[in-house]
Design a protein with these regions (language model features):
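Generic structural signal for well-ordered, non-membrane alpha-helical segments
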Residues: 3-6, 10-17, 25, 29, ...
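Aldehyde/semialdehyde dehydrogenase
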Residues: 26, 30-40, 44, 48, ...
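Short glycine-rich or small-residue beta-strand-to-loop segments that form or flank ligand, phosphate
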Residues: 21, 36-39, 109-111, 136-140, ...
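Rossmann-like NAD(P) dinucleotide-binding subdomain of oxidoreductase/dehydrogenase enzymes
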Residues: 89-230
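N-terminal Rossmann-like NAD(P)+-binding subdomain of aldehyde/semialdehyde dehydrogenases
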Residues: 1-99, 127
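ALDH superfamily catalytic-core signature
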Residues: 4-7, 122-123, 129, 200-276
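Short secondary-structure boundary/hinge segments and terminal tails
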Residues: 72-73, 146, 221, 253
């Protein structure tokens, strides 16, 4: 697809998003809370199906762990934000003479990874709806189908609960160029980017607010006072979860000298390998 056609498609999505953005402004806190609850419950009802789709399409990860991530991104995230005030006056401090008023930022570009496609789509959709923001997704090309399925479930639930019909949109023909065009569109107000280093760097280079999440170098320090068996067990469980694709899983371990031999023996016993 050439750049002109890509830009035309992005422009159409953004124009639809503008209408939904204006419709969101008419909703009150109670209505927004009902919408977010409905979206969360819809994903919870389909968490196993979406996990299966993610593993089959991407050929990555572990089915049971994808289930856990879908439950976390729907149920846990919902309960962590459900009582937050996000509409109108959220703070009225008469003593210090100030008020805080919550307003949506507008249109969000949501970039999702191949490693956590369904759970990231759910999470970003929930926080966008909670804050009355329209989100347009640029899904990873290798996870398009499972990501679209998740977005459709969320959109249907949201609209039934009273949300604007285009509150969740996505690029139908995904590509790096299409995602970059979305992020750089002048009417996109915020970028939520989860992906590889290159994509996150691109998001930060767009000249607008961007929140990026990418691979991290996560160290773990095991002190001599630690329960070494528990520490090793936790490390192996964490690093092997969903075949180690979580950005926040441990990448390096620093161990006190007097624990080195015991640590290495327990790691090998747990099925780990030392490559150098």
């Amino acid at each position: 697809m050439n750049n002109e056609l890509i830009n035309d498609k992005i422009n159409i999505l953004v124009e639809r998003a503008k209408i939904a953005r204006d419709e969101y402004l008419k909703l009150n806190q109670e209505q927004i809370n009902s919408i977010v609850k409905a979206m969360s419950m819809a994903v919870q009802e389909n968490h196993m199906l979406l996990a299966k789709m993610a593993v089959e399409e991407t050929k990555r990860g572990i089915y049971e762990d994808k289930i856990t991530k879908n439950i976390y991104s729907s149920e846990y995230i919902y309960h962590s934000i459900k009582d937050n005030k996000t509409v109108g006056t959220i703070v009225d401090n008469e003593e210090e003479g100030y008020m805080e008023i919550a307003e949506p930022i507008g249109i969000i570009a949501g970039v999702t990874p191949v490693t956590n496609p369904t759970s990231t789509t759910c999470f970003k959709s929930l926080i966008a709806a909670k804050t009355r923001n329209v989100i347009i997704f640029g899904f990873h090309p290798s996870a398009q189908q499972c990501s679209v399925a998740t977005a459709k479930i969320l959109l249907e639930a949201a609209v039934k609960a009273g949300a604007p019909k285009d509150c969740i949109l996505w690029i139908d023909e995904p590509s790096v160029d299409a995602t970059k065009a979305l992020m750089n569109h002048p009417d996109v107000n915020l970028i939520l980017a989860t992906g590889g280093k290159g994509m996150v760097t691109s998001a930060y280079s767009c000249g607008k607010p961007a929140l990026g999440v990418g691979p991290g170098n996560v160290p773990c320090y095991i002190h001599s006072s630690a329960n070494i068996e528990t520490s090793v067990n936790d490390l192996v469980l964490s690093k092997s979860f969903d075949n180690g694709m979580i950005c926040a899983s441990e990448q390096a371990v620093i161990v006190d000298n007097d624990l080195t031999n015991q640590f290495e023996a327990l790691m090998i016993k747990a099925g780990s390998y030392f490559t150098n």
